[in-house]
């Protein structure tokens, strides 16, 4: 029975195979038929196109014939006969003499060569007639259609030509002219004639056919014989095909049997394959379930959930018919719930950890930002500009500033000893009364961290914060469809932590730690948003940050009020700037903090100006007020070259050489004079003076100004550099630095003015005036520097293009000019005071000596000349006008003092010896005046004035020493020797005091005669009045 079933199945399978084979063969046949149809259509289409082309050619030929017909000529009999012969010869040659009509004429009555069939034999029967019915030329022209290209062209065939044998047949063969031809026949009732013509044409063709058949009869019989032989062979071939078909049927039955067997075996193979797949799926599902249990035990919940989803969505669905699979599928939600509880516990621990480490995270974030800012500042071209390319430590050395403890460029940002160790730092409390300088401003960042290569790192990795518990919770809650519930849970707990972060503790809190905790909190939120979007709402985080920003700003403003000098303010600003940049790096809105930082500039400038003025006051008090002596190359570079004072000194030395005509004043030690000889001065102007060997050869060297001048340059440069460092990343710095620099120089000018006013030493005041000249040049130096800094590097090249309104203007320069003028006036005033002090000692000189004295000048006049001799070299660096004014007023004061001595009312009497002593003093000062007046630097006016101040004194002294004083009244003698003595009452007063003491009987005749001459002179002078 089973064998029978198998056979039946095999037969069924074989039948199905045969059916499939037949269907496949049928499909192939259908495809081949479709392909043949398509090919046939293509060929028909191509043939139709060829027919159209041939018709077009025929039309062209007909048009040519029509044009020939319109000429009205008819071929002669001879031509007709030759045409018939041509037709016969063509018909015989077309197919080897055995063709029929179809071989020589196509369906349109044309020959195979494309020309119209000739009917000359028909014309021969009808003679030379033009047609059966002839029409007028006008009717013929109206019966045919016009050409579309030329409206005035004549018809192709006229009606008179239609009924000629040849023309009518041509018209009938052309379908385009058939209609008009037939119409004309019926209109003219010529049907019978037309029929006769056609019959004649048909008869002629029959004769032609018979003739052709007669000529090719033998060939036709041979062809029929060959065809009958071919028919017999066809029958044999048909029988062979029938036999072959039978054999194929037999072979096919065997193949069908084998096919049925193969089909049965294939079913068995498929059953085994399906069974194997089911077993493999069961095995994999069991192994995957075991893997899930293993992951759960290892706390790899993420992998466990993924495998459970794969198990549920893929494998268990395929095994839904098995009980164990249904049990496993039922336990998957239970296991997920268990995993949810476990991961939530881990998540809660993670929340506690990030709360405890928020300050550490914030601090590491600030360290990352500080390193980036430090690197940017090192490569920032503005830093090189603002530091003038110099070492800032050298500035402190020049200004005698002790090293600052907090030298860190990133503020009070110290690394914790260990990330998990507690931080001990001063406590911030609004009522603690501590200034920001005690809030940890002096803490430094680890130098190793600053010097190492600044690489971007993750603060979360450094603080050992992993976000795996959060991501795990997110995935698991999303897989069980409770993501929104977890979002609400996370948001609630983080908001509770946020409230704790922004509220300072009751016992107080380190303000840096307070900011770092806030920063750490929002860094975590930013990381969560970026890595889990759209898990958290950015709106919620931004609202939290806005509330924290209000609190932070309030705390910072309160701390800002406690800053009392620049150092804590700088450290405070740097810390806030790092905090702000870190928050900005994590995409939080920090514009209010930048506004707050901008408000610090005003206070910083106040503190910085105050400290700079105090530092300058110390410099001024410590200054030696002597010419600066440079002994080392290092000093020359840091004090002279760095401030371009060598250029200014060179210009002043050139001016000095021109004014002194190569007679330079060298002041200072004698050794300096030996070192600074003429050869050295010539070297000073060499083009290669900046080379170290050239400079070293000129050292030690003396400069006109004191050390205060390079210290002033350094102080201003340090002020500008520190301001730009403080205002890093702030806005509108240009106006602040211009205004602050101008204010600082004004304050320094006030210090100088006050110091000048209090100074009493003439050399000190002179040195200050010289220094002031260099300070004025320094203002120009810093003005050009600020212009290049603000207007760009090309300012020096394109100064003419820059608008005057855009240039930096330092009004303090005018104040320095005023102070310098004040100093110059003070020099003259102090000199006058000194001369008066020295001349005041002449009040005690003896005007009525009893004994003769020598001709030496007295001490007071020697001291005055010595003072002038010592002071004049100090005056030499000053301007020529000031020097002229100084020496002119000095000698004028001396002459006035001498006048006051001799005209003093307290002078009761004087004698000849007293006048001779005064004459010795006057000669000494006159000699000194002439010496100075003859110096080459003196102008003619100055020299004349210097000598002129003592001419009246000389005339008065000569008059008192004259043996004939009564000659004074002689106009000629007076005009020649006493023309400047115009105050007669004073002269009479002196003459009344001028007499020799009478000794009674022992008085000498000489004395008596002199007293008598004086009395006579007094009388004559009075009489002359």
Curated annotation (Swiss-Prot):
The gene is exoc6. Residues 71-93, 135-147, 666-677 have a biased composition (Low complexity). The keyword Ribosomal protein does not apply. Residues 1-122, 135-154, 666-691 are annotated as: Disordered. Component of the exocyst complex involved in the docking of exocytic vesicles with fusion sites on the plasma membrane. InterPro entries: EXOC6/Sec15, EXOC6/Sec15_C, EXOC6/Sec15_C_dom1, EXOC6_Sec15_N, EXOC6PINT-1/Sec15/Tip20_C_dom2. It comes from the Eukaryota. It is found in: Cytoplasm; Cytoplasm, Perinuclear region; Midbody, Midbody ring. The exocyst complex is composed of sec3/exoc1, sec5/exoc2, sec6/exoc3, sec8/exoc4, sec10/exoc5, sec15/exoc6, exo70/exoc7 and exo84/exoc8. GO terms for molecular function: small GTPase binding. It comes from Dictyostelium discoideum (Social amoeba). Residues 104-118 have a biased composition (Polar residues). This is Exocyst complex component 6. Signal peptide: none annotated. GO terms for biological process: contractile vacuole discharge; exocytosis; Golgi to plasma membrane transport; intracellular protein transport; vesicle tethering involved in exocytosis. Belongs to the SEC15 family. Residues 678-691 have a biased composition (Acidic residues). Residues 1-10, 22-52 have a biased composition (Basic and acidic residues). Gene3D superfamilies: Dsl1p vesicle tethering complex, Tip20p subunit, domain D, Exocyst complex subunit Sec15 C-terminal domain, N-terminal subdomain. Residues 19-68 form a coiled coil. Pfam families: EXOC6_Sec15_N, Sec15_C. The keyword Transport applies.
């Amino acid at each position: 029975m089973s064998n029978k079933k198998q056979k039946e199945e095999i037969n069924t399978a074989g039948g199905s195979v045969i059916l499939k084979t037949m269907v496949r063969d049928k499909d192939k046949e259908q495809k081949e038929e479709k392909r043949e149809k398509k090919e046939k259509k293509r060929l028909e289409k191509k043939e139709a196109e060829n027919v159209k082309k041939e018709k077009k050619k025929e039309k062209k030929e007909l048009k040519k014939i029509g044009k020939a017909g319109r000429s009205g000529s008819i071929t002669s009999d001879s031509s007709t006969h030759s045409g018939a012969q041509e037709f016969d010869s063509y018909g015989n040659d077309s197919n080897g003499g055995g063709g029929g009509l179809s071989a020589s004429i196509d369906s349109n009555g044309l020959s195979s060569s494309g020309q119209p069939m000739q009917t000359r034999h028909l014309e021969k029967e009808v003679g030379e007639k033009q047609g059966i019915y002839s029409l007028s030329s006008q009717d013929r022209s109206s019966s045919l259609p016009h050409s579309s290209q030329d409206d005035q062209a004549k018809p192709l065939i006229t009606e008179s030509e239609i009924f000629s044998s040849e023309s009518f047949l041509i018209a009938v063969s052309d379908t385009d002219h058939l209609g008009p031809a037939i119409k004309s026949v019926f209109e003219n009732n010529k049907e019978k004639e037309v029929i006769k013509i056609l019959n004649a044409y048909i008869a002629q063709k029959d004769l032609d056919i018979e003739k052709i058949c007669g000529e090719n009869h033998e060939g036709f019989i041979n062809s029929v014989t060959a065809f009958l032989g071919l028919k017999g062979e066809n029958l044999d071939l048909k029988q062979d095909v029938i036999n072959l078909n039978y054999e194929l049927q037999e072979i096919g039955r065997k193949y069908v049997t084998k096919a049925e067997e193969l089909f049965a075996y294939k079913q068995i193979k498929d059953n085994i394959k399906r069974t194997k797949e089911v077993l493999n799926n069961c095995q994999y599902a069991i192994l995957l379930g075991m893997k899930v249990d293993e992951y759960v035990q290892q706390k790899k919940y993420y992998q466990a959930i993924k495998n459970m989803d794969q198990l549920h969505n893929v494998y268990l669905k395929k095994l839904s018919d098995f009980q164990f699979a249904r049990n496993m599928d039922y336990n998957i939600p239970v296991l997920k719930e268990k995993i949810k509880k476990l991961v939530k516990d881990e998540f809660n621990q993670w929340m506690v950890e990030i709360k405890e480490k928020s300050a550490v995270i914030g601090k590491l974030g600030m360290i990352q930002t500080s390193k980036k800012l430090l690197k940017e500042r090192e490569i920032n071209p503005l830093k090189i500009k603002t530091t003038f390319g110099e070492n800032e430590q050298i500035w402190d050395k020049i200004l005698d500033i002790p090293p600052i403890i907090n030298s860190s460029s990133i503020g009070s940002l110290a690394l914790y000893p260990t990330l998990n160790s507690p931080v001990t730092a001063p406590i911030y409390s609004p009522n603690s009364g501590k200034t920001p300088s005690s809030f940890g401003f002096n803490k430094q960042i680890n130098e190793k961290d600053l010097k190492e290569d600044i690489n971007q790192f993750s603060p979360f990795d450094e603080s050992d914060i992993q976000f795996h518990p959060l991501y795990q919770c997110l995935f698991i809650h999303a897989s069980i469809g409770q993501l929104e519930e977890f979002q609400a849970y996370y948001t609630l707990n983080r908001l509770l932590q946020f409230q704790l972060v922004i509220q300072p503790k009751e016992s107080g809190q380190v303000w840096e730690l307070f900011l770092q905790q806030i920063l750490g909190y929002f860094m975590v939120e930013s990381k969560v948003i970026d890595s889990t979007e759209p898990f958290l709402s950015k709106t919620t985080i931004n609202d939290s940050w806005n509330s924290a920003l209000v609190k932070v700003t309030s705390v910072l403003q309160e701390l800002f009020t406690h800053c009392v000098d620049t150092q804590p303010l700088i450290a405070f600003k740097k810390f806030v700037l790092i905090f702000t940049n870190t928050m900005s790096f994590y995409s939080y809105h920090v514009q209010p903090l930048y506004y707050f930082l901008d408000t610090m500039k005003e206070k910083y400038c106040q503190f910085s100006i105050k400290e700079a003025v105090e530092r300058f006051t110390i410099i001024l008090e410590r200054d030696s007020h002597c010419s600066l002596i440079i002994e080392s190359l290092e000093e020359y570079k840091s004090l002279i070259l760095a401030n371009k004072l060598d250029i200014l000194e060179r210009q002043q030395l050139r001016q000095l050489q021109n004014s002194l005509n190569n007679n330079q004043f060298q002041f200072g030690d004698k050794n300096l004079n030996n070192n600074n000889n003429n050869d050295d001065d010539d070297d000073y102007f060499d083009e290669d003076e900046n080379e170290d060997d050239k400079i070293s050869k000129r050292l030690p060297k003396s400069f006109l100004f004191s050390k205060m001048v390079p210290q002033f340059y350094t102080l201003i440069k340090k002020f500008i550099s520190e301001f730009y460092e403080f205002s890093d990343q702030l806005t509108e710095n240009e106006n602040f630095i211009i205004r602050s620099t101008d204010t600082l120089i004004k304050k320094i000018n006030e210090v100088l003015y006050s110091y000048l006013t209090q100074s009493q030493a003439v050399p000190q005041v002179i040195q200050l005036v010289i220094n002031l000249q260099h300070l004025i040049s320094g203002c120009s130096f810093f003005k050009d520097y600020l212009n290049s800094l603000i207007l760009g590097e090309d300012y020096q090249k394109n100064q003419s293009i820059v608008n005057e309104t855009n240039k930096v203007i330092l009004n303090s320069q005018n104040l320095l000019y005023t102070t310098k003028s004040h100093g110059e006036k003070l020099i003259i005033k102090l000199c006058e005071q000194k001369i008066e002090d020295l001349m005041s000692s002449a009040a005690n000189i003896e005007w009525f000596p009893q004994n003769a004295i020598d001709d030496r000048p007295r001490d007071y006049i020697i001291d005055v000349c010595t003072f002038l001799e010592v002071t004049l070299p100090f005056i030499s660096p000053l301007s020529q006008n000031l020097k002229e004014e100084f020496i002119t007023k000095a000698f004028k004061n001396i002459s006035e003092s001498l006048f006051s001595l001799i005209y003093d009312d307290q002078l009761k009497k004087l004698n000849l010896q007293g006048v001779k002593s005064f004459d010795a003093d006057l000669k000494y000062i006159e000699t000194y005046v002439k010496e100075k007046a003859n110096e080459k630097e003196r102008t003619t006016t100055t020299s004349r004035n210097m000598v002129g101040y003592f001419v009246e004194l000389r005339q008065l002294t000569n008059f008192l020493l004259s043996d004939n004083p009564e000659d004074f009244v002689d106009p000629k003698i007076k005009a020649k020797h006493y023309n400047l003595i115009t105050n007669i009452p004073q002269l009479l007063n002196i003459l009344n005091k001028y007499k020799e003491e009478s000794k009674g009987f022992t008085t000498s005749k000489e004395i008596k005669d002199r007293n008598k001459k004086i009395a006579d002179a007094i009388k004559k002078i009075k009489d002359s009045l």
